[in-house]
């Protein structure tokens, strides 16, 4: 990799002037190592996976060692930069911390380099996090900033790695960053120019150890001078109050109070940076439904804090297209809608997907990651016509449906073949579906027990639906 932008090495933070250990040679780790290598720094990468090791060696002229070797030589390093997915209880990270070595992540590293002026004048950082809606909101906010004339790009989990945005030959002035709880855990000094927490619900408990630790990681973005939260999320409001956070901007589906954005007379309205200023019609926002309106309000709150006009917000929303697997109607056949919301990887996201539907044939299952699905099932029992269940935690889901939605039909596939399992459930869906029903893929669980990711899961669902419809036409 070659550096593509002017750098000021004299501004390099002292902690990065010694030997640096990077843990992980995946996408993030490779990006970290590449940026540090291009700066001429002394980098060693720890990775046990042989395929990842060989791929990195082909890309970069850096030393690659196993994690046990790295543990045995921690005294050689001045700092550890970890890939965000590495858990805090990983032995090499535990040992590093016990020796007093600082452990940070890719976002923290990029933040420190940018704020130190290594890549020129510091960028504006707009950080977006929460349990659900991050990607859509980040994309909306980037679109609003661009519409307002800012040189902005969406970075982080949504697409461009933060390291790539910093080193790009086309300078970026505004980084609209979708940040995960993992990245924020490893970002102890990050203070973005604006921080947004959309909502909080149980997720990644297996990684963080508790819901509270997960939530506290998310709230790190609220150290920003402009801090925005979902005012309809009672737990988030209670937590920020407990933490003594003040001066927050809120967004709500209701009429906005002081320092809030909300909905009034069918319009998104700003009552935080103006007096009940209409921004855009609530009708026609993509994605449709309450979740889309909330995402638009959240993005608008941050955009308004940066000086984007109501006209530019309306213009951005008018042309905004949602990313895949977030509520797309795959097909409509004989009065039945087939909807792909594979991105609903936890109960909170599935709750949003189920809300407002009248009669749902629900395809659900995967890895619950420690989350409890009982409340979700009980809340929507009246609309669940059938539950079609797959995945590693299928037994737990079946128990919840039997207890809390006893009138729902249940079908379970024990197949671990990703295509066969989905086709089996789609076949059941076609047999059960009647005009007015919605066949909804909203798994409420992660996909990696059977699929390469939520995208593949959604694609296979769509393929199964469309091929079944086509097959029926040929009969």
UniProtKB/Swiss-Prot annotation:
GO CC terms for this protein? cytoplasm
What keywords tag this UniProt record?
ATP-binding, Cell cycle, Cell division, Cell shape, Cell wall biogenesis/degradation, Cytoplasm, Ligase, Nucleotide-binding, Peptidoglycan synthesis
Q: GO: which molecular function terms?
A: ATP binding; UDP-N-acetylmuramoylalanine-D-glutamate ligase activity
Q: Would the keyword Chloroplast be found if you checked this record's keyword annotation?
A: no
One Pfam family hit:
Mur_ligase_C
- Tell me if Ligase is a UniProt keyword of this record: yes
User: What's this protein's function?
Assistant: Cell wall formation. Catalyzes the addition of glutamate to the nucleotide precursor UDP-N-acetylmuramoyl-L-alanine (UMA).
Q: Which family does it belong to?
A: Belongs to the MurCDEF family.
Its protein name is: UDP-N-acetylmuramoylalanine--D-glutamate ligase
Its source organism is Corynebacterium efficiens (strain DSM 44549 / YS-314 / AJ 12310 / JCM 11189 / NBRC 100395)
